[in-house]
Regions:
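Concave beta-strand-loop units of leucine-rich repeat
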Residues: 66-131, 136-172
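N-terminal Sec-pathway targeting helices
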Residues: 4-20
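Residue-level recognition of alpha-helix termini/interfacial anchor residues
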Residues: 9, 33, 130-133
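Aromatic (phenylalanine/tyrosine) cluster motif
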Residues: 5-6, 23, 114-117
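LRR flanking "cap" motifs
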Residues: 36-87
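Short amphipathic alpha-helical segments that mediate assembly, nucleic-acid/protein binding
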Residues: 12, 43-44, 127
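Membrane-interface motif at the C-terminal end of an N-terminal transmembrane signal
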Residues: 24-35
Length: 172
């Protein structure tokens, strides 16, 4: 009789563990299939474009954003905030303002956008919070083409334990 009691108790524990595991899996599935709410509409467009050609910001899901390995955001001045980069948890390569190796000579300097000093300081602060939080980042590339994006302090890169390559271009 006591054996039966312990056997039933063990079976109950096993069933409870199985139910908890199933519940956690279902919650994870629901979370990953939720639609992302971006803080910046231009960054939402850039991230959705990175995911695929037929993806628009309204139908981006967390599982799509987590799958991004490489992100090139271009000129940071077109964004109100860079916070949405944090959503790309598996990001390995981040390129900001192109890469110096990607620039083609421009005919006119008017073709280039420039950041104000205050904007550059704001983005530098945001990057110092965002980049170290990207645990898998291996390559960081930044370009200050014709001093259009004067971010000068990259000390935050020292906090990135998986960083293998840092490319900082300055054309001056």
């Amino acid at each position: 009789m006591i054996k039966n009691f312990y056997k039933k108790k063990n079976n109950l524990y096993i069933m409870l563990v199985i139910l908890v595991v199933i519940f956690v899996v279902i919650l994870g599935y629901i979370y990953m299939n939720r639609h992302v709410k971006f803080k910046d509409s231009n960054m939402a467009y850039e991230i959705s474009r990175t995911i695929g050609p037929n993806v628009n910001p309204e139908n981006v899901k967390y599982k799509d954003v987590y799958a991004i390995k490489e992100l090139n955001i271009g000129f940071p001045g077109k964004y109100d905030t860079l916070e949405d980069i944090k959503l790309c948890k598996n990001l390995r390569i981040l390129t900001i303002n192109g890469g110096g190796d990607k620039w083609k000579p421009l005919k006119k300097e008017e073709d280039i956008d420039f950041l104000l000093y205050e904007q550059a300081q704001k983005y530098q602060k945001e990057l110092s919070d965002i980049v170290p939080s990207l645990k898998r980042i291996e390559i960081f590339s930044f370009s200050n083409y014709l001093e259009n994006c004067n971010i000068s302090n990259f000390d935050f890169l020292a906090k990135c334990c998986n960083m293998k390559v840092i490319k900082i271009y300055d054309s001056t």
